[in-house]
Amino acid sequence: MTPSLSAFINSLLLGLFIVVLPIGTALLLVSQSDRVTRN
């Protein structure tokens, strides 16, 4: 694997991590908080 490809994959994973983590946390918090309304 070339250094540029490795750097590209690393940045892709980092971007994915930065995007997915807050969204996942927000969804989790919302699903925890409105559990009463959806029974």
Curated annotation (Swiss-Prot):
What is the first-listed, main subcellular location in coarse terms?
plastid
Where does the protein end up?
A: Plastid, Chloroplast thylakoid membrane
Alphabetically sorted, this entry's keywords are: Chloroplast, Membrane, Photosynthesis, Photosystem II, Plastid, Thylakoid, Transmembrane, Transmembrane helix
Plastid in keyword set: yes
- Disulfide bridges in this chain: none
Concerning Gene3D superfamilies, the annotation shows:
Single helix bin (1.20.5.510)
Please, which domain of life does this record's source organism belong to?
Eukaryota
Q: Which GO terms describe its biological process?
A: photosynthesis
- Give the UniProt entry's GO cellular component terms: chloroplast thylakoid membrane; photosystem II
Membrane-crossing ranges are 11-31
- Please give, as recorded in its UniProt entry, the membrane topology of this protein: Single-pass membrane protein
Q: Which family does it belong to?
A: Belongs to the PsbX family. Type 1 subfamily.
Q: What does this protein do?
A: Involved in the binding and/or turnover of quinones at the Q(B) site of photosystem II (PSII). PSII is a light-driven water plastoquinone oxidoreductase, using light energy to abstract electrons from H(2)O, generating a proton gradient subsequently used for ATP formation.
What is the annotated quaternary arrangement, including any partners?
PSII is composed of 1 copy each of membrane proteins PsbA, PsbB, PsbC, PsbD, PsbE, PsbF, PsbH, PsbI, PsbJ, PsbK, PsbL, PsbM, PsbT, PsbX, PsbY, PsbZ, Psb30/Ycf12, at least 3 peripheral proteins of the oxygen-evolving complex and a large number of cofactors. It forms dimeric complexes.
The name of this protein is: Photosystem II reaction center protein X
Q: Which gene encodes it?
A: psbX
